[in-house]
Amino acid sequence: MRLARLLLGAALAGPGPGLRAAGFSRSFSSDSGSSPASERGVPGQVDFYARFSPSPLSMKQFLDFGSVNACEKTSFMFLRQELPVRLANIMKEISLLPDNLLRTPSVQLVQSWYIQSLQELLDFKDKSAEDAKAIYERPRRTWLQVSSLCCMACKMIFTDTVIRIRNRHNDVIPTMAQGVIEYKESFGVDPVTSQNVQYFLDRFYMSRISIRMLLNQHSLLFGGKGKGSPSHRKHIGSINPNCNVLEVIKDGYENARRLCDLYYINSPELELEELNAKSPGQPIQVVYVPSHLYHMVFELFKNAMRATMEHHANRGVYPPIQVHVTLGNEDLTVKMSDRGGGVPLRKIDRLFNYMYSTAPRPRVETSRAVPLAGFGYGLPISCLYAQYFQGDLKLYSLEGYGTDAVIYIKALSTDSIERLPVYNKAAWKHYNTNHEADDWCVPSREPKDMTTFRSA
């Protein structure tokens, strides 16, 4: 039975000794043959926790976990073991990157963040929210008073640690991107390395999204700093149980439009249509993380506006961007159509490639600004956000006319399950196996001179 199911079931039932009886205390000892205490140093700790697979949660489980029955103690017990597992799994893959990439200052900085975060989390591995002696002890207090104070202190310390880790990892994406640029500029990129780096970054950034989701949920639910703005009071952590899709789309459009107006002094209009096939006549709502959806549509709007403005620059008339939203029994689909001239078929894959970008190199210290072009990571990261809860993002282009971008999101919260990378033999082989030659004929860039071939 997965660790997540044990703990989430306990969360709904309320706190108690049942977790220990269910085998939670044995989850990192009985199956592995050793305990983390027996491993020495960071490499040993990483090796130990990387032996375990992450426990993916569904959107429904996130909702149940953050409901009125939510228990901070259960969140503490789950995260103190799940977060090291997720960190260690991806840290093993970081160590398999090319040596020259690992030596870049930016990648070394990212590694140091992950090591520090893992060590801070492991400070809690032997502590209990109810273990008074582990956290706090004062003379002249009754055991009940001490236990209550210690339980509160432990949870507060852990929550502060979670918030500190979340803030530390704020710039993981641009910093790792900077490392890839440093490597590319110094050593160039061959096809095999490019393929391995693409494989790694997809998994690394997906892991980062999942870790941040856990950190955000705990800090927003138990951070103790109020409920946020009135518009977010119905949220469960970062999840809106009734996310109004059209409102998020309009928000993304307006913000992208402001940037477009600043840069091009004009912008295309928006034509928005919705079709609720599941509940006709009702607004389209779905259980989702609004910030994830916003990231996707904002990125797509920026791309569509940029293409439209540049393709029609000489005409002075800019066709509108059309967005169609439909909700069916299984999928929520958002299709964004522009008339920005499209992209040749051979270039579509490049748009999702981290190693390929025509944009000028940005500075990391200004990475929090939102330009119309940056590292070239907008589309691949947006695709990962869509895939994180079993959705997807696809591009369909008509060269000379325009592009359709389609976002797929699961309509049911029970189907929206985390997609998590796991370090195993298959992943290891991907980094260490020599890729064989293509088993299909690859056409040359120039046509062959057939006069050089003579019949026998």
List each language-model region with its residue ranges.
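Flexible, glycine-/charge-rich segments associated with ATP-binding catalytic modules
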Residues: 2-3, 18-74, 95-101, 126, ...
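Signal-transmission coiled-coils
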Residues: 35, 39-274, 286, 290, ...
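Short helix/loop segment immediately N-terminal to the Walker
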Residues: 187-189, 266-273, 278-280, 310-318, ...
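Conserved ATP-binding N-box helix of the HATPase_c
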Residues: 258, 288-319, 328, 383-388
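Conserved catalytic core of two-component histidine kinases
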Residues: 274, 323-327
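Acidic ATP/Mg2+-coordinating residue in the GHKL
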Residues: 338
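Glycine-rich G1-box
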Residues: 341-342
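Short acidic-aromatic loop segments in the C-terminal HATPase_c
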Residues: 352-356
